Amino acid sequence: MSDKPLTDVTFSSFDLHPALIAGLESAGFTRCTPIQALTLPVALPGGDVAGQAQTGTGKTLAFLVAVMNRLLIRPALADRKPEDPRALILAPTRELAIQIHKDAVKFGADLGLRFALVYGGVDYDKQRELLQQGVDVIIATPGRLIDYVKQHKVVSLHACEICVLDEADRMFDLGFIKDIRFLLRRMPERGTRQTLLFSATLSHRVLELAYEHMNEPEKLVVETESITAARVRQRIYFPSDEEKQTLLLGLLSRSEGARTMVFVNTKAFVERVARTLERHGYRVGVLSGDVPQKKRESLLNRFQKGQLEILVATDVAARGLHIDGVKYVYNYDLPFDAEDYVHRIGRTARLGEEGDAISFACERYAMSLPDIEAYIEQKIPVEPVTSELLTPLPRAPRVPVEGEEADDDAGDSVGTIFREAREQRAAEEQRRGGGRGGPGGSRSGSGGGRRDGAGADGKPRPRRKPRVEGQAPAAAASTEHPVVAAVAAQAPSAGVADAERAPRKRRRRRNGRPVEGAEPALASTPVPAPAAPRKPTQVVAKPVRAAAKPSGSPSLLSRIGRRLRSLVSGN
């Protein structure tokens, strides 16, 4: 990322398919960014690439041009069936996969290539039918694609001649590395397959993956003067936890109408912050794991069209999303990972534009600041929290945005979105037989672990009668369970059964010897008649025997004494 994001290298200078050049020009792409100018000379002839570049530098277009040009000018593998894909593009998140698919269709719709978008959270059967019909390029997240690959009748990767791994470092962070290796082993060998890998950082584990599954990849690094975008104006405030919402409202009132993204660390705070902004009259969208996938796509589309002013999101939206015109990025919570900070503020000042990144360092997350400043190799300017900033300015009357009234989701509030999300999640758990309140959710029979005093049929349980002191407890057989009552009536009482049973004779031992005259042991359970008192058994103590004199040869002292006596008597 530099002040000049575009180079003098043009796409027409490469040996590209004429239809591809026409599609790029119609989409407005004429000159290359630095990562594109480095990647295309290596990737177009068929070489493997391990590229490092920060977010917003045009990595997506670099590998899309290489993939489409190969499919247009080269024939498919000999053993490929018409429905088998020829290219696979893997992304770590759904939002990034959707963005890649949107860019691919933008300038590749007229090339005759068939694209399929595969990710979780949407209709499983529709995606399966699309794959069974046959596609040329699959753009997917690893988890959902593996489900289809394991069903061999759905999709096979044996004829996939080019593979792209985007945001490889994020793949490791999300635990997808085993899934990636599983998919790579289902493709042709690395000598036949072309692999393009892109990452914000080429760490040791990323390079290990590259050299394990790639064919002598060429390492390409876009040198930058700073890790963060040069046109991002960064500043940080140190508010208390109680001042964060007030400070956010005060700063937003001073940038009225600007497209803004607010990042928080947890899904719970997405709803809390969004509700606060909505109460103050802002048009707010939310993006987190709790929001259903279709609703996330709808809200993101409305934000891109300008129908929403603010998008409150977790780090699910920090990578890969290209939204034009984002002027302000707020780190309501400082991220734990310094790389996430770079990706968050990378949503603004893309491709040479300018933007502001404003961070709040509260008591809970301020400890992340030293690591962030060490990673970006610069100090973030500190601004004071004044009483003026804590006072929001009066807002102008809201002006409806074109096309907002025709949108079906325009009237959805933040509370409605999260309530529908919770209801949908509860219905999904109920359908699967899970949940605490549904069948199968309780560990102790039916009822689902109810704590409101209701029985399995929903009716209140009768109050238990108090027990009279001295009275034996009654059998636990109710009229609601006639089988249990019948079995209990036929079973003899414990006292009668124990009285009829003969006592077992026990042989007691003391010091390893049986004791004569020991009485038989009583039954373990009480009997109606009291047992006779047992007479104590007297054990006769045996006298201790004196130690026996040693037998055999005399001792050494005895022999010495006899020898001395014989010597004396001989004199």
Curated annotation (Swiss-Prot):
Ranges of Basic and acidic residues composition bias in the record: 419-432, 449-460
Biased composition (Gly residues): 435-448
Any Gene Ontology CC annotation: cytosol
Biased composition (Acidic residues): 402-411
EC id: 3.6.4.13
EC class (word): hydrolase
Catalytic activity field: ATP + H2O = ADP + phosphate + H(+)
Chain intervals with Basic residues compositional bias: 503-512
Protein's recorded name: ATP-dependent RNA helicase RhlB
Species this protein is from: Xanthomonas axonopodis pv. citri (strain 306)
Gene name for this UniProt entry: rhlB
